[in-house]
C-alpha cells in the first residue's frame, strides 16, 4: 500500500529524471493563445460553484471559466480538483506543482481565498481577480423563529456541513447547548436541501448555497435571518483566482475580463442564472 511518503518520493524521482510533462510549467498568455486552450481548475463537488449533474460539469465557476476562455479566444479545459487539507495545499496541487497522483496543474484556478496574509505565504502563485464576496447565512423553516437567540432553537434540528465554521459555531457556542441538535451533511448544499425538504428546521451555510438551494426548490422558500448571529466570528471573505507567479500576463488579461464583466452586468447575470445574488468582492474596490 502506497504511503504519502512513498508518493512524495516517487514524484521527486520523476522530477529529477525530467519525466514530468511540460504542461507543469503554467502557461502565460501567449502560450495559452498558441495552444488554443486554457486549463481552469475548479473544486469537485462544490455546489453551486462546480459539480457534476447528468454527467456534465456545471456551476457558477464552470460558467465563469467558459466565459473567460471565450473572451480570450480559446477553449476551456475545466478540471475538477479534490480539496486537500488546506487551501495552501490546493494551490500547490492545482496551480504551481500538481497533485501527487498525477493531477496536472491548471493555467488558472478559481474559488481561491483573496486574502493578503494567505497570498503572502503562497508566493509561488499570484492571487488575482476578486470576483465575489461570500458570507454565511441562516435560513429556517417549519415555523422556526430565525431572528431569535440561537439558544431558543434547542430541540430543533439544525443542518450544517460537517467540520465547517457553521458546525463549530453551533456545537461550541452558548456552552454547547445546541450540540445535540446539530445534524451533519457532507456539503453545505446538502444541508440546505435537507432544510428545503423539511428534514431540518434550519440551516447555517453560505449565502450562495442557500440562494441556489431556494432557486431549485420549485417555489419552496425558507426565511432568511436578517440580523447577525451573536458571537459569530466570520464577517465574510472575498473569492478570487490564482495563476502561477510567472504567468502574470495571463493574470492581467483575466483581471481585465472579470472587471469588464462586473461593469457590464454580465457577472450579475451569470450569478442570477443560479438564483445567487452577485455581491462584489470588497477588494474589487
Regions found by a protein language model. Name each.
Residues 6-25:
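N-terminal export signals
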Residues 28-106:
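Extracytoplasmic small-molecule ligand-binding "clamshell" domains
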Residues 37-44, 58, 148-166:
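Short loop->beta-strand "edge-of-pocket" segments that line small-molecule binding or catalytic clefts
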Residues 43-44, 132-137, 217-255, 277-284:
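Periplasmic-binding protein-like
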Residues 65-71, 143-146, 156-157, 162, ...:
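Extended ligand-binding regions for polar small-molecule ligands
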Residues 66, 70-75, 79-81, 129, ...:
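Ligand-binding cleft/hinge of the Venus flytrap
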Residues 78-151:
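Acidic, polar ligand-binding/catalytic clefts
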Residues 108-121, 169-172, 196-197, 201-235:
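A ligand-binding cleft/hinge motif common to bilobed small-molecule-binding domains
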Amino acid at each position: 500500500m502506497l504511503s504519502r511518503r512513498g508518493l512524495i518520493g516517487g514524484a521527486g524521482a520523476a522530477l529529477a529524471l525530467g519525466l514530468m510533462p511540460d504542461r507543469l510549467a503554467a502557461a502565460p498568455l501567449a502560450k495559452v493563445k498558441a495552444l488554443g486552450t486554457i486549463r481552469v481548475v475548479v473544486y469537485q463537488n462544490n455546489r453551486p460553484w462546480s459539480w457534476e449533474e447528468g454527467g456534465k460539469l456545471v456551476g457558477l465557476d464552470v460558467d465563469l471559466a467558459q466565459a473567460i476562455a471565450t473572451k480570450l479566444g480559446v477553449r476551456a479545459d475545466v478540471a475538477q480538483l479534490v480539496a486537500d487539507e488546506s487551501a495552501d495545499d490546493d494551490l500547490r496541487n492545482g496551480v504551481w506543482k500538481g497533485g501527487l497522483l498525477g493531477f496536472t496543474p491548471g493555467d488558472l484556478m478559481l474559488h481561491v481565498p483573496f486574502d493578503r496574509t494567505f497570498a503572502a505565504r503562497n508566493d509561488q502563485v499570484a492571487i488575482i481577480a476578486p470576483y465575489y464576496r461570500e458570507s454565511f447565512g441562516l435560513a429556517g423553516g417549519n415555523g422556526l423563529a430565525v431572528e431569535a437567540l440561537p439558544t431558543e432553537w434547542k430541540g430543533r434540528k439544525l443542518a450544517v456541513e460537517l467540520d465547517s465554521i457553521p458546525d463549530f459555531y453551533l456545537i461550541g457556542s452558548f456552552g454547547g447547548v445546541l450540540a445535540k441538535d446539530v445534524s451533519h451533511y457532507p456539503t453545505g448544499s446538502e444541508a440546505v436541501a435537507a432544510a428545503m425538504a423539511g428534514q431540518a428546521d434550519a440551516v447555517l451555510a453560505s449565502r450562495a448555497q442557500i440562494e441556489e438551494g431556494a432557486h431549485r426548490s420549485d417555489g419552496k422558500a425558507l426565511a432568511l435571518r436578517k440580523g447577525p448571529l451573536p458571537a459569530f466570528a466570520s464577517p465574510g471573505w472575498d473569492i478570487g483566482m490564482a495563476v502561477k507567479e510567472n504567468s502574470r500576463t495571463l493574470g492581467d488579461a483575466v483581471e481585465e475580463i472579470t472587471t469588464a464583466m462586473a461593469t457590464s452586468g454580465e457577472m450579475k447575470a451569470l450569478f442570477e442564472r443560479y438564483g445567487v445574488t452577485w455581491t462584489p468582492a470588497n477588494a474589487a474596490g
